[in-house]
Amino acid sequence: MVDTLGVELTPELLIEFETILHRGTTMAANGESGHFKYIPNRIRNSSVQVALPSEIPTAIPALLAEWESSPKDFESISRFHARFEHLHPFQDGNGRIGRLIMMKQCIENGVDLIVIDETHADEYKSWMEIAQTQATSDSSMRFFGSANLLLTPGCTR
């Protein structure tokens, strides 16, 4: 990931992240990684309806274009993350890839890191579901803001 700091997010880079995540796994051996999803999937333990495989080829470039034209601040990162997770573009590993992208965006743009640790995992998932079902990232921004206050000493946001 360090090699990609300063490198623009592209569909190919997202696929590279997913390929690295699954390297050496059964998914990779079975040809189930290294590309966007081709089978409908869902978020485990959630009622959120994610994008269909046929929507991904246009939805991902649109999301990336929106990111490139954004102010690249805390709110933009939160919004991007909620939308990425709602698309759920890969067969597996979307949460891990989404959090990796979020960390890359924070580092590149001088934004306090948004870190979700185990003690906040359930709350994170609940807030993400609210953000995705209400078609707004306000909930995820509030959660990330409160998580930052808990995890970043001296944060005054």
Q: What label would you give each PLM region?
A:
Residues 1-157:
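FIC/Doc superfamily catalytic core
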